[in-house]
């Protein structure tokens, strides 16, 4: 673990901590965008398929990503390669009311907008103008909820039902499964995805790309952890992939004067867009689409 962190020191010395974490976000984002575009990874499609009871392989693609991310993350923790106990999602006080209300709003918006935030970004990168406009509205609304006009409402809702940080937010501790149980949980669902993928004849890039997306989730945990261990001047948060906060941060970077501090999130969003664009370019899938039939 210490050796891995030491290997990052030459890069940190050369470009600095801020650029190192931003470049890490860019590289991971690029690979995520490429794999997400090739696999057609989309939570909305998986939810619709599940609700309709159809078997088109979209839920299986999502399951490949989910199980791979869980399995690899737990394996890295068990191997002693990383420790995510200091991650914001576990350390800070949590809001169950915020998760439920926000989750319901996110799910409804995902269906109405025809894609979650990551899918809208991927679609926009291949020329879908509807997805681009929807993504911009999403980013503006996210920024308003984080620190703008909607933030008092968000804070009020999040205060309805809260839980302490630490073990009170760790499902593996609450259930008593531990990281070994988490590893087995991921392995069982990955095995299920393999069986369903074979039965549904999921194409190569469907399952391979979905696994690649899952690997990027675990890679983000690992890389941010290692850089946080090697950094001296900056406090680097341990995190994985999300798109609500990063979308808002990227929007503010564009609108704010030059000289804003860089971070993982600000490399992630353009990286995803570039990765999806390259995938669409290589497979000749670039196409301008509007609202009519888009």
Give residue ranges: language-model regions.
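Membrane-interfacial helix-loop segments of redox and metal-homeostasis proteins
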Residues: 1-294
């Amino acid at each position: 673990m210490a050796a891995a962190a030491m290997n990052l020191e030459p890069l940190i010395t050369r470009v600095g901590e801020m650029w190192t974490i931003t470049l890490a976000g860019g590289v991971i984002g690029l690979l995520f965008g490429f794999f997400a575009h090739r696999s057609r990874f989309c939570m909305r499609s998986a939810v619709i398929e599940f609700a309709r009871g159809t078997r088109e392989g979209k839920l299986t693609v999502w399951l490949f990503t989910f199980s791979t991310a869980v399995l690899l993350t737990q394996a890295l923790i068990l191997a002693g390669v990383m420790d995510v106990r200091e991650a914001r999602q576990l350390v800070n006080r949590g809001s169950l009311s915020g998760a439920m209300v926000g989750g319901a709003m996110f799910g409804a918006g995902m269906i109405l907008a025809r894609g979650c935030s990551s899918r809208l970004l991927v679609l926009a990168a291949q020329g879908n103008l509807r997805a681009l406009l929807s993504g911009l509205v999403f980013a503006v609304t996210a920024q308003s909820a984080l620190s703008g006009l909607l933030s008092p409402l968000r804070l009020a809702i999040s205060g309805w039902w809260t839980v302490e940080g630490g073990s009170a937010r760790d499902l593996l501790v609450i259930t008593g499964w531990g990281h070994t149980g988490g590893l087995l949980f991921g392995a069982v669902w990955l095995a299920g995805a393999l069986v369903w993928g074979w039965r549904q004849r999921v194409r190569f890039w469907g399952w391979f790309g979905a696994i690649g997306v899952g690997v990027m989730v675990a890679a983000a945990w690992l890389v941010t952890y290692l850089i946080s261990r090697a950094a001296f001047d900056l406090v680097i948060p341990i995190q994985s992939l999300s798109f609500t906060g990063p979308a808002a941060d990227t929007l503010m970077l564009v609108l704010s004067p030059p000289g804003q501090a860089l971070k993982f999130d600000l490399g992630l969003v353009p990286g995803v867009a570039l990765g999806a664009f390259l995938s669409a370019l290589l497979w000749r899938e670039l196409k301008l689409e509007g609202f009519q039939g888009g």
